UniProtKB/Swiss-Prot annotation:
Keyword Cell inner membrane: no
Residues linked to a lipid group, S-diacylglycerol cysteine type: 21
Lipid-acceptor residues (N-palmitoyl cysteine): 21
Compartmental location: Cell outer membrane
Originating gene: traT
The name this protein goes by in its record: TraT complement resistance protein
Disulfides per UniProt: none
């Protein structure tokens, strides 16, 4: 009997350790805010002595980004450019739209987070499994085992690896001395089974380039209020560095 009790204590202790290790590992590895910004395509602008920029910053996400244009303007000015309010007087146009700024799942790219979640479930299963060994005190042992699993689940619930992602489409136009001809083609839906094709041709004096900027902020128990300023700063820096 004494041996069985000792084995039960050892198994429960192991269960608690296993169920809590995922949460502890997450808390340690993700205690500091990590920020990463990537651009889908490189934009090469021709060297020019003109240093005037017109900004048009939009936000179609559900988050407040009212200070974003100011940050981008400051970053552009820090590069030695003048921000103007008239597009006709600007050599460069920078147009950007924040498509989405929200919490996004990183489980597919971070397998260690999956293992952390599995820890609590394994704890509950191990606790219930003790019943098969110690049938003389099945009720008490099952209760202890499930309690151990619930402790692990509670620990995992308190420690969450959170990643916020901001996705921004960017278009930059630069003036050129040559005449630029642009052919536009648009397919407009007509009901559920048809489409209308629209084509147009225009001439101008601008070359236009498009890219997408993806910024990530990752930290344990991260709130958007903490992620927002660094995401905005990263986007502003990335856009300004194109110039």
């Amino acid at each position: 009997m004494k041996t069985k009790k000792l084995m039960m204590v050892a198994l429960v202790s192991s269960t608690l350790a296993l169920s809590g290790c995922g949460a502890m590992s997450t808390a340690i590895k993700k205690r500091n805010l990590e920020v990463k910004t990537q651009m889908s395509e490189t934009i090469w602008l021709e060297p020019a002595s003109e240093r005037t920029v017109f900004l048009q910053i939009k936000n179609t996400s559900d988050k407040d980004m009212s200070g974003l244009q100011g940050k981008i303007a400051d970053a552009v000015k820090a590069k030695g450019y003048q921000v103007v309010t008239s597009p006709d007087k600007a050599y460069y146009w920078i147009q950007a739209n924040v498509l989405k700024a929200d919490k996004m799942d990183l489980r597919e790219s971070q397998g260690w987070l999956n293992r952390g979640y599995e820890g609590a479930a394994v704890g509950a299963a191990l606790g219930a499994g003790i019943t098969g060994y110690n049938s003389s005190s099945a009720g008490a042992t099952l209760g202890v085992g499930l309690a151990a699993g619930l402790v692990g689940m509670a620990a995992d619930a308190m420690v969450e690896d959170v990643n916020y992602t901001m996705i921004t489409d960017v278009q930059i136009a630069e003036r050129t001395k040559a005449t630029v001809t642009t052919d536009n083609v648009a397919a407009l839906r007509q009901g559920t089974s048809g489409a209308k094709i629209q084509t147009s041709t225009e001439t101008g004096n601008q070359h236009k380039y498009q890219t997408r900027v993806v910024s990530n902020a990752n930290k344990v128990n991260l709130k958007f209020e903490e992620a927002k300023p660094v995401l905005e700063d990263q986007l502003a820096k990335s856009i300004a560095n194109i110039l």
